[in-house]
């Protein structure tokens, strides 16, 4: 019984993580556009970021915190600003 419950918890956790990563991707897209970059590939190219990888971040791929901080600095966005209202999406 414990094994079955732990499997359900794992699925719930993975689903929750997926939702948060999608939200992070949506926020990255929002702030990129707010910074004046209509195209994600152009933003990545201009800032020496792998274009395919940046596209994956906006699509909801897992992103390391240090990478997120670096990208936000390029957009002149603080972590506080980035996560303000995060749960309202």
Annotate the PLM regions.
Residues 83-89:
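Short amphipathic recognition helices of helix-turn-helix/homeodomain-type DNA-binding modules
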Residues 36-56:
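Short alpha-helical DNA-recognition segment
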Residues 33, 45, 73:
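Alpha-helical residues within the helix-turn-helix
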Residues 30, 41-42, 70:
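Alpha-helical residues within helix-turn-helix
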Residues 2-35:
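A short, Lys/Arg-rich alpha-helix, primarily the initiator
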Residues 66-81:
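DNA major-groove recognition helix of helix-turn-helix/homeodomain DNA-binding modules
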Residues 50-52, 64, 78:
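Short coil turns linking two alpha-helices in DNA-binding domains
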């Amino acid at each position: 019984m414990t094994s079955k419950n732990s499997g359900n918890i794992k699925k719930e956790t993975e689903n929750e993580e997926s939702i948060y990563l999608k939200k992070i991707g949506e926020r990255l897209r929002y702030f990129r556009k707010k910074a004046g970059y209509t195209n994600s590939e152009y933003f990545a190219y201009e800032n020496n970021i792998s274009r395919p990888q940046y596209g994956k971040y906006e699509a909801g791929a897992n992103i390391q915190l240090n990478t997120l901080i670096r990208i936000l600095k390029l957009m002149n966005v603080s972590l506080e600003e980035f996560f303000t209202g995060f749960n309202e999406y």
